[in-house]
């Protein structure tokens, strides 16, 4: 019976991870804006989905570990907000980099892979409240290992879903060119860079506004 329940929890964590990538939020927007606005290919799409997931999972694990050893002296919510601000700043930097590359295409060669890794790490710095809640609940009940396992399974589901979306965006490029036209498509880097900057600003402003309202 216990094994059946654990299996159900694992399946639920996996499904929730997949669904999390489809929930309203900046994850999909960042992936779409970057891939459609740069020369990212299938390898870049897979790398982006994987990097976001690794960064996402590492941050949750870090917050969980910090909550164990520094529970009395550390406010996990404050660390969460700090991660959001740092992630937002990096997103803004990536957005500026995309726009700069568009405006000055001959000044330097665009390193797509470097941009993918930077973007993936920054987007993953904003922890998922649901996954963090599962880990903290497991810690409070003395089941740290179970919590880490469920978060890892959640992250696998997230990785599959995010990577699938990224690949879909790559494959849709040619379709967009066909129906929109190359002239308009050439403006995509300017649009995508602006969107990523706005998302970065929102990521920074969100925790600040929450504290201001409270």
UniProtKB/Swiss-Prot annotation:
Keyword Ion transport annotated: yes
Cell compartment(s), UniProt: Cell membrane
Gene Ontology CC annotation, any one: plasma membrane
Membrane topology of the entry: Multi-pass membrane protein
Stretches of the chain forming a coiled coil according to its record: none
Sorted UniProt keywords: Cell membrane, Cobalt, Cobalt transport, Ion transport, Membrane, Nickel, Nickel transport, Transmembrane, Transmembrane helix, Transport
Main location: membrane
GO molecular function per UniProt: nickel cation transmembrane transporter activity
Superkingdom of origin organism: Archaea
GO terms (BP aspect): cobalt ion transport; response to cobalt ion; response to nickel cation
PANTHER family in alphabetical order: NICKEL/COBALT EFFLUX SYSTEM RCNA, NICKEL_COBALT EFFLUX SYSTEM RCNA
Family: Belongs to the NiCoT transporter (TC 2.A.52) family.
Name of the protein: Putative nickel/cobalt efflux system MJ1092
UniProt organism field: Methanocaldococcus jannaschii (strain ATCC 43067 / DSM 2661 / JAL-1 / JCM 10045 / NBRC 100440)
